[in-house]
């Protein structure tokens, strides 16, 4: 684990407040400590939503992300994804599979359907094994009637409504 010396320099110069730096460092630690206890089992390493997304989901659930960052990620991921997909720079066929905040904040939002979603997501990794995907995990946890495409659209709509407040 490492912290950008440029970021630390911004704290020293006063460009970043000590409170903001403390908040960010706490969030980074939550993310990295999640990896220590994370089960990835037989999940293909090409499933970045599982590894990095899960760590950011826990970070978000623990209050390690600002509301503004979470909302902006939901609202801006589409343009980022479309741009990178056109140029062939994304290994993810679906936007919700993008690692870190994009999939992570979405996973955390899915707790609105099941408050125990993140724990069950970890269980799904063991239960589904090499067949694991976020799409399959969502249906394993919430039921066959829940389509990830519809949930993603609802998540973005929720972010839009929060952004207006």
Language-model regions, residue ranges each:
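Soluble non-cytosolic domains of exported or imported proteins
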Residues: 19-28, 45-49, 94-101, 112-115, ...
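Active-site nucleophile-His-acid catalytic modules used for acyl/amide transfer and hydrolysis
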Residues: 40-44, 92, 119-120
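Intrinsically disordered, low-complexity segments enriched in small/polar residues
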Residues: 5, 78-79, 98, 153
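Pan-zinc metallopeptidase signature
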Residues: 97-165
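Active-site/pore-lining binding-face segments in mid-to-C-terminal subdomains
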Residues: 82-103
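Zinc-dependent metallopeptidase catalytic helix centered on the HExxH motif
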Residues: 1-74
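General structural signal for secondary-structure boundaries
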Residues: 4, 21, 77, 82, ...
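Short helix/loop segments within enzyme catalytic domains
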Residues: 61-87, 110, 115-127
């Amino acid at each position: 684990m490492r912290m950008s010396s440029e970021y630390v320099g911004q704290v020293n110069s006063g460009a970043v407040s000590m409170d903001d730096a403390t908040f960010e460092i706490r969030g980074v630690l939550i993310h990295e400590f999640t990896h220590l206890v994370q089960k990835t089992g037989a999940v293909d390493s090409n499933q970045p939503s599982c590894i990095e997304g899960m760590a950011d989901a826990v970070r978000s659930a623990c209050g390690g992300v600002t509301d503004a960052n979470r909302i902006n990620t939901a609202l801006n991921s589409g343009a980022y994804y479309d741009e990178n997909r056109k140029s062939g720079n994304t290994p993810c066929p679906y936007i919700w599979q993008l690692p870190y905040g994009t999939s992570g904040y979405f996973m955390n939002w899915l707790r609105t359907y099941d408050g125990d979603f993140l724990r069950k997501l970890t269980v799904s990794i063991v239960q589904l094994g090499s067949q694991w995907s976020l799409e399959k995990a969502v249906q394993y946890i919430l039921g066959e009637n829940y389509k990830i495409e519809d949930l993603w659209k609802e998540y973005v709509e929720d972010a839009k409504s929060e952004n207006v407040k």
